[in-house]
């Protein structure tokens, strides 16, 4: 084999090893992002909800700041209920990792009938939240507010 070919092969192997260490985005969170953007007709990226108020994004505490933050609080509670279901009691059936089937048609989100009990429950949590997000006012001042004012979500 030509030395240049060996060098290219080595570079590919090294880059693949590096990429293998990058954790993938949990599939159900990717589903949730798609449902959000379906329900709001693509008017706002799902990332805009990743760190909003006291409950949108990782964790959550305190009093929700507005209707949108209340949507996230309800969604957090729904995931908590999903984790209590016997059908969802192992790691890969966690709401954060369990991918489900859905359809999006002109802003209407539908969880499909081929989901098992756990997937159907998680899909309905995400569907309800996505519809709630689409109907709530987005207050720009509440984006990343917990980082701007760490006393607000006590």
From Swiss-Prot:
Q: Please state where this protein is localized.
A: Secreted
A GO MF term: calcium ion binding
> Which interval of the chain is the signal sequence?
1-27
In this UniProt entry, which cysteines form S-S bonds? 38-104, 54-153, 56-72, 71-132, 78-125, 88-118, 111-123
Q: What is its EC number?
A: 3.1.1.4
> Which residues does UniProt mark as catalytic?
75, 126
Its chief place of residence is: secreted
BP terms from Gene Ontology: arachidonate secretion; fatty acid biosynthetic process; lipid catabolic process; phospholipid metabolic process; positive regulation of fibroblast proliferation
Tell me the SMART domains matching this sequence.
Answer: PA2c (SM00085)
Cofactor binding remark: Binds 1 Ca(2+) ion.
Q: Which of UniProt's keywords are assigned here?
A: Calcium, Disulfide bond, Hydrolase, Lipid degradation, Lipid metabolism, Metal-binding, Secreted, Signal
**What is the reaction catalyzed?**
a 1,2-diacyl-sn-glycero-3-phosphocholine + H2O = a 1-acyl-sn-glycero-3-phosphocholine + a fatty acid + H(+)
What this protein needs as a cofactor is: Ca(2+)
Q: Quick one: which residues bind Ca(2+)?
A: 57, 59, 76
Supply the InterPro entries for this chain: PLipase_A2, PLipase_A2_Asp_AS, PLipase_A2_dom, PLipase_A2_dom_sf, PLipase_A2_His_AS
Q: What class of enzyme is it?
A: hydrolase
GO CC, sorted alphabetically, is: extracellular region
In terms of CDD domains, this protein maps to: PLA2c (cd00125)
Tissue expression profile of the protein: Expressed by the venom gland.
- Write out the function statement from the record: Snake venom phospholipase A2 (PLA2) that has a low specific activity on phospholipid substrates, and is neither neurotoxic, nor myotoxic. Induces endothelial cell migration which is mediated, at least in part, by its hydrolytic products. Shows antimalarial activity, but is not able to potently inhibit HIV-1 replication. Binds in a calcium-independent fashion with very high affinity to a muscle-type (M-type) PLA2 receptor, but is a very poor ligand for neuronal-type (N-type) receptors. PLA2 catalyzes the calcium-dependent hydrolysis of the 2-acyl groups in 3-sn-phosphoglycerides.
Its family remark reads: Belongs to the phospholipase A2 family. Group I subfamily. D49 sub-subfamily.
User: Quaternary arrangement and interactors, per the entry?
Assistant: Monomer.
| Name of this protein | Phospholipase A2 OS1
Please give the organism.
Oxyuranus scutellatus scutellatus
């Amino acid at each position: 084999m030509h030395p240049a070919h060996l060098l290219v092969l080595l570079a590919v192997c090294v880059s693949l090893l590096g990429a293998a260490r990058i954790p993938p985005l949990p599939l159900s969170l990717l589903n949730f992002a798609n449902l959000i953007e379906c329900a709001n007709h693509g008017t706002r990226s799902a990332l805009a909800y990743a760190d909003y108020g006291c409950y949108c994004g990782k964790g959550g505490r305190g009093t929700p700041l507005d209707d949108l933050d209340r949507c996230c609080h309800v969604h957090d509670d729904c995931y908590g209920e999903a984790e209590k279901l016997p059908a969802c009691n192992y790691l890969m059936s966690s709401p954060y990792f369990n991918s489900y089937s859905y359809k999006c048609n002109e802003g209407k989100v539908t969880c499909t009938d081929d989901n098992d009990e756990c997937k159907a429950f998680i899909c309905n949590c995400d569907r309800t939240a996505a519809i709630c997000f689409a109907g709530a006012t987005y207050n720009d001042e509440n984006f990343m507010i917990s980082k701007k004012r760490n006393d607000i979500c006590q």
